[in-house]
From Swiss-Prot:
Pfam families per record: tRNA_Me_trans, tRNA_Me_trans_C, tRNA_Me_trans_M
Protein name per its UniProtKB record: tRNA-specific 2-thiouridylase MnmA
Entry's transmembrane regions: none
Family from the record: Belongs to the MnmA/TRMU family.
The enzyme's E.C. designation: 2.8.1.13
A GO molecular-function descriptor: tRNA binding
Catalytic activity: S-sulfanyl-L-cysteinyl-[protein] + uridine(34) in tRNA + AH2 + ATP = 2-thiouridine(34) in tRNA + L-cysteinyl-[protein] + A + AMP + diphosphate + H(+)
Compartments it resides in: Cytoplasm
Keywords annotated in UniProt: ATP-binding, Cytoplasm, Disulfide bond, Nucleotide-binding, RNA-binding, Transferase, tRNA processing, tRNA-binding
Length: 359
């Protein structure tokens, strides 16, 4: 099989490439250049998409004795990931750019080019598993990345390979060291690669500008003025521009955002409880949409826990009734529906959250 391996320069994709070589495949490595000005992406040993990462990926390819290329996807990345990220915050949403990158860049633009060039599959260093065409959680639950892959269609998954999903991260590092790969001890990346400072509010403010609005309490009383709804997300406690706790002495959190009026509503922790979720643009990873109701578990954050729920689908809307409330769920987040399975929880569907309601 002719396999293109997306090599980020990190330990996971490096071991993924090595395993593909060991399996006897015809392997080519590729690193994605995602910025026209690489200095705007994270530099140094921590992060991804930096010039240093490209060099690390090339050195691993040399050790593995495989061809290696750098492909420029900067324009697509800006349009489909960065611009989408900014626009989502303008709408008062909280997007996940890693989800969008997998959907639009790695498994669409990159995979599409790979197939056009005659490759049979795209392999990545994601912690996830595929069995019988079904996407499942990784063996290493702490590193599982099925959440950020749940937007992939059955057609996209048909050409995907996840070589390390059956192995704990600690063993991946040990294997890299045994293979003599210099990235064996390279730190993991955690933050958004195109915000090197880690200051999301400043990044958005520089692109959106000042759009003043009011911070109000549950009764509509104005408490403060802000410079744009893009500086807030549901559940946020710090940086609200208000003095002290609420009248009850308890902390106040962002409980609602109305981008049309520029209003940010704050309230108590209990106002963040959510019992019902609705999602748009559903994707059914097996290719078959379920009707419902389906007993399941739902995850609403990349590193969040699983919550018991009942899901149903009708007319392009995915609806979830929770058995117990989730706290601080925002529009724009991705919700992923899992079916519990001893062989590895199966991803049934995903959707972009459009509604999160209390009782």
């Amino acid at each position: 099989m002719r396999v293109l391996v997306a090599m980020s320069g990190g330990v996971d994709s490096s071991v993924a490439a090595a395993r593909m070589v060991d399996a006897g495949h015809d392997v080519v490595g590729v690193h994605l250049a995602l910025s026209a000005t690489p200095g705007t992406l994270r530099t140094g040993s921590r992060g991804c998409c930096s010039k240093e990462d490209a060099g690390d990926a090339r050195r691993v390819a040399d050790v593995l004795d495989i061809p290696f290329y750098v492909w420029d996807f900067a324009d697509r990345f800006k349009e489909d990931v960065i611009d989408d990220f900014v626009a989502s915050y303008e709408r008062g949403e909280t997007p996940n750019p890693c989800v969008r990158c997998n959907e639009k860049i790695k498994f669409s633009a990159l995979a599409g080019r790979a197939l056009a060039l005659g490759f049979d599959a795209l392999a990545t260093g994601h912690y996830a598993r595929l069995s019988d065409g079904r996407l499942r959680r990784a063996v290493d639950a702490d590193k599982d990345q099925s959440y950020v892959l749940a937007v992939l269609t059955a057609q996209q998954l048909r050409h995907a390979v996840f070589p390390i999903g059956d192995t704990p991260k600690a063993q991946i590092r040990a294997e890299a060291a045994e293979r003599g790969l210099a990235v064996a001890d390279k730190p993991d990346s955690h933050d958004i690669c195109f915000i090197p400072s880690g200051d999301t509010r400043a990044f958005l403010g520089a692109r959106i500008g000042v759009r003043r609005g009011a911070v109000v309490d549950a009764g509509g009383t104005k408490l403060a003025e802000h410079e744009g709804v893009h500086g807030f997300t549901i559940g946020q406690r710090k940086g609200l521009g208000i003095a002290g706790p609420g009248p009850d002495g308890q902390p106040r959190y962002v409980t609602g955002i109305d981008a049309a009026t520029g209003t940010v509503r704050v309230g108590g922790a209990e106002d963040l409880d959510v019992w019902r979720l609705t999602g748009e643009r559903p994707v059914f990873t097996s290719g078959a949409a379920f009707g419902g109701p389906v007993e399941c578990q739902v995850q609403v954050r990349a590193h969040g826990g699983l919550a018991d729920a009942v899901a149903s689908h009708d007319a392009g809307v995915l609806s979830v009734e929770l058995r117990a409330p989730l706290r601080g769920v925002a529009a724009g987040q991705t919700m992923v529906i899992y079916r519990p399975d001893p062989e590895g929880d199966e991803v049934l569907a995903s959707a972009t959250i459009s509604g999160a309601d209390g009782r």
